[in-house]
Amino acid sequence: MSTLRFRNALPSDAVRCHEIESTAYEGDEAATLAKIETRIGQYPQGFLILEDAGHIVGFINSGCAHDVVMSDEAFKELVGHSADAPNVVIMSVVVDPASQGKGYSTALMREFVQRMTALHKATIHLMCKERHVSLYERMGYRYVQPSPSDHGGMAWHEMVMELPGA
């Protein structure tokens, strides 16, 4: 039986997270090591790690904004991020391909939503590919619109979840 543990990211996790991101995402959509280091350094509360038996198998990272513009590429480097802002913007939900199919992304998202609710956030926003829209709808997200973003040269769709008490 595996031992799952959630925790916030530490600077020493950046290289492993970059390995997972580079392996799981296609083309130019993976964040650089520098972006991952920035996200850990500036908003560790929004960078959730999932470990299985002490080994990092996945993570979610995010930033917060007062006004959400999902196509804002600069925000991926946390330009405009404000930890006290009410709206969370997820930049990556990623599980090591060798560990996919075990329900880890759903477990990560449930824990992430609980943590953001505890921080009194109002909404969580994300962009996903068309094939993931129904997955996020099952997790409680609402479809917003096709995104004007062409991050990584791909088509994206914007989703949002309103959190309890918002």
Predicted feature locations:
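A short beta-loop-alpha structural element at the N-terminal edge
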Residues: 4-17
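Conserved acyl-donor/pantetheine-binding loop and adjacent beta-alpha core of acyl/acetyltransferases
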Residues: 56, 60-100, 110, 149-156
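Conserved G/P- and acidic residue-centered "switch" motifs that form tight phosphate/ATP-binding loops
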Residues: 103
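Conserved GNAT acetyl-CoA-binding A-motif
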Residues: 109, 114-129
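Conserved catalytic-core motifs of GNAT/GCN5-like acyltransferases
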Residues: 64-67, 125-127, 137, 142-158
